């Protein structure tokens, strides 16, 4: 019988390793999700002089409760590092993000930082990206957008932090670059949850009792 994977412990290991990458004086992007929630306590314990931007109200509230300063993104000219989780991390460096419905903000932050670090448990590491792929959609003309997209399922979830409708593409992924381009061309799609390897600096994978570091 295979050994039971302690997902909680793996998330915590990856999160603690990422917290150690943050240094005094840095500007830091904080992602959204269960693994990022485990990043905040060890980051707060270090009592660093940092300035942070959060990708969701949930992360902002949790960070402020722990004494981590959070500012509006537009006050920061650049980000030294951003740390976020992922729903899937493929061997070729593609990510799927957006299980928490904040992938539009997460992608903006990932593109604006000099170092985007992804933290996951071993169950999120996959050979190839597969559905579902999260989508944020404009509420206006939603039915027309859904018809154009085809294989999409609306999610029973709260709107995105910016009021978008959250859905999932559930069709064949195939080449993620081709799918990303096709989804982006559909009017009404605010953003999709496919993150290309060019955005990713490194991935920290909690695996058993260790952290595996993958450079993309």
Task: For the regions a language model picked out, list residue spans one by one.
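N-terminal glycine-/serine-/threonine-rich phosphate-binding loop
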Residues: 1-82
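Conserved phosphate- and dinucleotide-binding cores of soluble alpha/beta proteins
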Residues: 2-6, 58-60, 64-216
């Amino acid at each position: 019988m295979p050994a039971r994977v302690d997902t909680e412990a793996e998330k915590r290991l990856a999160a603690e390793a990422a917290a150690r990458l943050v240094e005094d004086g840095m500007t830091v992007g904080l992602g959204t999700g269960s693994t990022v929630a485990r990043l905040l306590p060890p980051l707060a314990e270090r009592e660093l002089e940092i300035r942070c931007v959060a990708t969701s109200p949930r992360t902002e509230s949790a960070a402020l409760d722990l004494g981590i300063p959070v500012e509006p993104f537009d006050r920061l000219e650049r980000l030294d590092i951003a740390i976020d989780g992922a729903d899937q991390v493929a061997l070729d460096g593609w990510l799927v993000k957006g299980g928490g419905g904040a992938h539009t903000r997460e992608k903006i932050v990932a593109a604006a930082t000099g170092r985007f670090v992804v933290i996951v448990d071993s169950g999120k590491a996959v050979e190839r990206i597969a559905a579902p792929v999260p989508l944020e959609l404009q509420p206006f003309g939603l039915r027309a957008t859904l018809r154009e997209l085809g294989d999409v399922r609306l999610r029973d979830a709260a709107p995105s932090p910016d009021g978008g409708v959250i859905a999932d593409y559930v069709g064949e992924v195939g080449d993620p670059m081709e799918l990303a381009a096709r989804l982006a061309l559909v009017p009404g799609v605010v953003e999709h949850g496919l993150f290309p390897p060019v955005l990713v600096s490194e991935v920290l994978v909690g695996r058993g009792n260790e952290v595996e570091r993958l450079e993309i």
